[in-house]
Amino acid sequence: MEYASTFQRPILFHGGDGASYCFPNRLISPKGISITSGDSKVHSCFRLRRNVAQSGTLNLMNACFSGRFYSGHLHSTKSILGNGHQAKRIPFGFRLRCQGHESLGNADSNDHRIGESSESSDETEATDLKDARVENDTDSLEELKELLHKAIKELEVARLNSTMFEEKAQRISERAIALKDEAATAWLDVNKTLDVIRDTVYEEALAKEAVQTATMALSLAEARLQVIVESLEAGAGNDIPHVSEETEETIDVNDKEEALLAAKDDIKECQVNLDNCESQLSALLSKKDELQKEVDKLNEFAETIQISSLKAEEDVTNIMKLAEQAVAFELEATQRVNDAEIALQRAEKSLSISQTPEETQGQLSDEETSQEDAMVLSGNVEDVTHQVEKESPKDGDLPVVQITAELVPDIVGQRNKKLTQPYESSDHENGKPSVESSKVVEADSEKPKINVQTKKQETQKDLPKEGSSLNSPKASFNKSSRFFSASFFSSNPDGTATVFGSLVGSVKQQWPKLVLGLALLGAGLTLYSNGVGGNNQLLQQPDVTSTSTEDVSSSTKPLIRQVQKLPKRIKKLLEMIPHQEVNEEEASLFDFLWLLLASVIFVPLFQKIPGGSPVLGYLAAGILIGPYGLSIIRNVHGTRAIAEFGVVFLLFNIGLELSVERLSSMKKYVFGLGSAQVLVTAAVVGLLAHYVAGQAGPAAIVIGNGLALSSTAVVLQVLQERGESTSRHGRASFSVLLFQDLAVVVLLILIPLISPNSSKGGIGFQAIAEALGLAAVKAAVAITAIIAGGRLLLRPIYKQIAENRNAEIFSANTLLVILGTSLLTARAGLSMALGAFLAGLLLAETEFSLQVESDIAPYRGLLLGLFFMTVGMSIDPKLLLSNFPVIVGTLGLLIVGKTMLVVIMGKLFGISIISAIRVGLLLAPGGEFAFVAFGEAVNQGIMSPQLSSLLFLVVGISMAITPWLAAGGQLIASRFELHDVRSLLPVESETDDLQGHIIICGFGRVGQIIAQLLSERLIPFVALDVSSDRVTIGRSLDLPVYFGDAGSKEVLHKIGAGRACAAVVALDAPGANYRCVWALSKFYPNVKTFVRAHDVVHGLNLEKAGATAVVPETLEPSLQLAAAVLAQAKLPTSEIANTINEFRTRHLSELTELCEASGSSLGYGYSRTSKPKPQPSDASGDNQIIEGGTVVI
């Protein structure tokens, strides 16, 4: 058979089941290097202690990449120490240390020689050890490079092998499909022949009836003839009658003769008819026999073809398994290449780290020598300068500096002469010319420079290798904050533009806003300094004395007092302006204007900061104009009440983007991970507050539960800005936040019951149980009413309003639904945001969700920004300065502690360590409900106002740093997750909460565009690719891209193919496309498959393999070019649109039917319900052509 070809495994030591390969206990290379898997150290045959220690720093264990290593390829290319190694001696006198200003430390020649020999011997030994270690490290690097090169070759072979098997699988599958079609055709022929036989049998029956009828007719004709003959014979036997009787008898005889002739004719006709019927019957019988024989032949042929088709199906299954194994070997080869690259990078880093101290030590010794020389020179220069000052007149013609500059070269020359004298004497004594000795000195002095330059070049070469995946283009994905490469703040000597330069340019463009912001800041500092009175001591500094060579001055006034001089003049000018009293309405208007002004100034500025977010801008604006800043906002409580609706609209928008099915798939993390996070964090923080901080039991309970909550508004906003809402950590974070919104109800019910002012006199478990039971009943009734009313009333109400075509009424109805459900849940004891979330979840099932989302977008943005500003208003900078260590310590414990707890909990629930860290960093800050809980605790006498103020500040600052914590999580993922290919493999626990998602098979050009469109609409998807580089690019963009074979049943199961609604197959190779479609149609037939076809023939084969719809990859570019050409030919736009649409419809009939059923065109032209009406062909008015000849349709 064609598919019965084999491929060999790499020559490795098998270390277990599957495809894991590892070292044996000991491998001995032919050149004396032994590698031990226990401690993974390289020991040279010379057994030099320093060399062994240095080889330990090299860590060849890095080469044992994750238990997999090539065994037969390890060998040493050269010995660790060269055979003819010659140590270079450093001539005596080069490193003599000078004592005094001009003395050089004279000694007799014997002492010089003894010192020279001992020093040179030590340096020779150290040089030998160093060279041995360097050569050993170099050998190891060469071995690793050779291993990497062989791994790359094996990867190329594996890729060719997998491509070959995929092509064979496609050919065998197409042959099987052809045999199946042929068998179907054969059975169709059999059935047709059987139908003909049935018709023949029917005709035979008719013919038999005709024969019987003809036979009966012949019998009747013969009977009539016999009667006539008998009557004639009877008439001839009578006597002769009279004349009249004779005449009558003659007439009778004539009639009988005529009847006899007619009877004979009838007999002939019946005989002819009978003969015809018998001939037809015989023909039908012969035809029937022939047809039966043909049926037997066709049946036998069809059975043969059917058997061949079944065998072909088995062959297809076998070749698909072989192709899957080939792709699996390709993936393993990719992993080995990745492991080899990591091992090589680590080895090079360890080598560079081990060589850096030696170079720095040599550079330090050179610097010490140069410093001694400089000290001698400086001493001589000072003496000469002193003499010149004495000898020169007071108003000399030349300045002292110029005279000194002229005398320095002479001193240097004298110093060089004194230094070269020992060289010359020693060289002449040894019989060597002085020129050679000077060359040796120059060569030794230039060695460190060359080594440093070569190492810098090597490290610069290594940097692109490590950061290639992270430096991939990310501009195609619309995300607000990304990470910057190492060259972000570096300046290019060639004068090319850098990111830092562009940042400076943007600051220059925004200088009016900066000036206005600084003016507001200065005014705020002025008002603050004037208002604090005696509290200015916080800004004062102790007396600082600054001395210089000219004078001594002391400054005792802080900077704020110097700034106060300017505002006094401004105050005088303001007093001259007539004032007018401001009423409450104008005050509210001024508050609104200040809020808008601050947001317009600070939000763009903070977006320019690396890793910045609009949330930070709103928080900074709130701090500045809040009661603890400039105190510009007068009605803070009213502002906070209105700002709460920002969270309400945010949760409503989140509900619109979800569905009931997707929410049900998240129940494991909502009620599992969410409850575990809240309970464990509350318990740990409460115990710390009680036993460490000495807080009372009720206060510890409130503190633990309040700090266990996180900010739903901040976290979801940051996730949306970064485009991470559909990522693994984004989904897990949202699940926990959803449960926290439910847990707030319990906390707010619990606070009055544990208050010392309560009528129960403390904690009463019966009262708590009764209150919680009543709250649960109220919540259940409210949620049931919202769900039932929404399912029954929302769709007909919105349909009726949509028929009126009034946008204002539509928006008003949306606001009514949001505020009504929020009020209902608030009256039931739940949060307002939860009611809005339920309303959005119900509206998401209707066809009006997109319009509703666009209507509430302006309200959501403004109110959410207002909410963040109110959070900033709660931050007290004065309190931060006075309690800085306590607040920073508490903040650090909160962030680190909650992150560790969430990581542990997330790992228990099957989340990867990197995703769990990112979830922990997002949920570590406090939340907005902590303000409500702590405020209620103060009102109930559970905690003091001072403690609540400190906690307010900690929670506010933690919410402010949430964007940077999210950026830190992405940095951790980019540093630790992207290096190892195994971390990119699909895990079932990473996708078990997905429902109705999209599977993208292939993350190339087409797959990336589809992923971008889905990500912008927050539609959940999972992408697969066998290229680790593409997967790394996707992961660096926080997209759910996994390294795996899209044609494997196990991989498809791990990404939740059974719960997916559709799959897009956009692989490069036609064979891989076919194999993926085959696997999806066989194992997951309910998943609709949309495939990218290479050409029409390939598309037909894919349709036969089970593809739902096939899109030729050349169709859309051809249509775009054709539209441009038709537009250039002066055809009207309507005619071009109709032509292109008709052509597309003919070639995409199946896709068009699906689009019409869903009510949209999915990007493939106009739907039939919205075709443009034909317009008069006016070439000047209808053709809308942009630059380049493309058409705007």
From Swiss-Prot:
An annotated Gene Ontology molecular function: potassium:proton antiporter activity
Description of how activity is regulated: Repressed by sodium ions Na(+).
Basic and acidic residues: bias regions: 439-465
Induction remark: Up-regulated by low K(+) stress and down-regulated by high K(+).
Keyword field: Abscisic acid signaling pathway, Acetylation, Antiport, Chloroplast, Coiled coil, Ion transport, Membrane, Plastid, Plastid inner membrane, Potassium, Potassium transport, Transit peptide, Transmembrane, Transmembrane helix, Transport
GO BP term, example: regulation of reactive oxygen species metabolic process
Region of interest: Disordered: 103-135, 351-372, 421-474, 1165-1184
Segments forming a coiled coil: 131-355
Chloroplast intermembrane face of the membrane: 607-612, 662-668, 720-733, 788-827, 882-883, 934-948
SUPFAM superfamilies: NAD(P)-binding Rossmann-fold domains
Ranges of biased composition (kind: Polar residues): 351-364
Entry keyword Transit peptide: yes
Other comment: The full-length protein being inactive in a heterologous system, the N-terminal region seems to have a regulatory or auto-inhibitory function.
Protein name per the record: K(+) efflux antiporter 1, chloroplastic
Species: Arabidopsis thaliana
